[in-house]
Amino acid sequence: MNRIQQTFQTSSAPFWYAQLELGFCYENSRTIMSHRKHYGPVRVQKMLWPEKTGVCHAIIVHPPAGIAGGDHLTFQIETERQAHAVITTPGAGKWYRTNGKHAFQHIYLNVKDDSILEWMPQETMLFDGALAHSETDIHLEQTASFIGWDMLVLGRQARAENFVQGSYHNQFKLWRKNKLLVADTLYFEGGDRWLSSCLGMNNQAVMASFWAVPPEKFRSSFYLEQHIELIRELIMRMDVPVTLTLLEDVLCARFLGNDVRRCHDAFAAIRAKLRRYWFDLDEEFPRIWKT
């Protein structure tokens, strides 16, 4: 874990460089945090072990609660063999209206053989006028498993705010043993026709993606097709605007709508089913979601 290098930040600077580096390993029948390093206002708020199998639930927090123009926020997280970590945030993230400078978030996840990482941050709000760049790079070893999502809300819905100024650039890449499985890129500017087009956002305010990679023994088409049909039945019962597809052996779900709570509930339900099918685990939602 050497991607992150220390950046010095003076108290008079108008922006932050915040970086968090975490490592998880399996020891004495549970997952523990074996490595932690942070710079700037980002850290682990709490760790919990609510599951009998010793899964570590970690809550990471960025005290400013959002990313302003000029900020650089970086996460680097690694799970060692047999470790199982669930990572979430205490509340919605925010891309604030810019001061003319671009803001950046970089997420690097490295999942070793026979380990499981669940990356489940709460939604991110894109304020009108934000200039946001987000990059997620996930590297899986051959027998690693992953569940994760990204939820974006355009504007502040409580203020009926639309995204008419600024820009958003998101790049997501998922690799296994240096083979690129998924490359997902999104770019738009405030006021773009794409935001209102039926071929784009269709005037909806919430878009989200869910990604899941099963354990190696469940990657055959027999299991994948069976599990995706069960998930489709779940989505139909919930009556939510979610579509499902398979990209090789990666399960992908997409949400497009106006209610971020419905999105969260749908993705949490999919995650709960996959935990049962793939890992024989209960749903065990992070406790912070209930507060």
Curated annotation (Swiss-Prot):
Q: Name one GO cellular component term.
A: cytoplasm
Subcellular location as annotated: Cytoplasm
Report a single Gene Ontology molecular function. nickel cation binding
InterPro entries according to UniProt: UreD
- Domain of life the protein comes from: Bacteria
Among Pfam families, the record links this protein to: UreD
Keywords, A to Z? Chaperone, Cytoplasm, Nickel insertion
Chief subcellular site? cytoplasm
State the function annotated in the UniProt record.
Required for maturation of urease via the functional incorporation of the urease nickel metallocenter.
Quaternary organization:
UreD, UreF and UreG form a complex that acts as a GTP-hydrolysis-dependent molecular chaperone, activating the urease apoprotein by helping to assemble the nickel containing metallocenter of UreC. The UreE protein probably delivers the nickel.
Q: Which family does it belong to?
A: Belongs to the UreD family.
Q: What is this protein called?
A: Urease accessory protein UreD
